[in-house]
Regions:
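A detector for small-residue-rich transmembrane helices and their helix-helix packing motifs
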Residues: 1-194
Length: 194
């Protein structure tokens, strides 16, 4: 499922570029035409589908490149832990939820990107580590927690310093993913895969 999600994101980006959208720095108007999130359209215009479609659009090749690299890194492990269906559920709900939080905090900004969904996958991974910690060897647990904390710390600090990073979508996705991860970690698939 992780590879499928990466392929979908990349395919949409390539189609957008072929259709004339800049690969380096897409204009907000172009992203809106493709389904980016934007308060006046999503809320006032009743175009709620934008909460979903925005999860598959990106602000340029660097944005999608970094997002897909991170999704691959954390996604493969998290997918193994939860199984395909639950993993997809986490990804989509965290992405949409992150966009809802972003819309609440920045109603007049154009929002796009898989970051909320990816932070949700990270949150689910951390939820699994918390709930299933008794079955994970201590050294492996320490390495995984350290790696996750470094990644999240760097991204959250960068998000505070960068005006172009939607920290609210990141935090919203992370929180939703963590809650879902804690809940779903009690499932038989998660126990079997531990």
């Amino acid at each position: 499922m992780t590879l499928t999600l990466i392929a979908i994101n990349v395919l949409i980006f390539v189609i957008m570029v072929v259709k004339g959208v800049s690969a380096i720095e897409p204009r907000p108007e172009d992203l809106l035409l493709w389904g980016a999130d934007f308060g006046p359209l999503t809320l006032a215009g009743g175009q709620w589908w934008r909460l979903f479609t925005a999860c598959f659009l990106h602000f340029g090749i660097i944005h999608i490149g970094f997002n897909m690299y991170v999704l691959y890194q954390v996604g493969m492990t998290t997918e193994f832990l939860y199984g395909r269906a639950k993993y997809l559920f986490i990804y989509l709900l965290a992405g949409v939820g992150g966009n809802i939080v972003s819309l609440y905090v920045h109603p007049d900004s154009v929002g796009a990107g898989a970051s909320g969904a990816i932070f949700g996958v990270y949150g689910a991974f951390l939820g699994f580590l918390l709930i299933r910690r008794s079955v994970i060897p201590k050294l492996a647990m320490a390495q995984m927690v350290r790696s996750a904390v470094i990644f999240l710390g760097i991204n959250l600090v960068y998000g505070v310093m960068s005006r172009s990073t939607d920290l609210s979508a990141h935090i919203g996705g992370l929180a939703i993913g963590f809650v879902l991860g804690c809940y779903l970690s009690h499932s038989p698939a998660a126990v079997r895969n531990a």
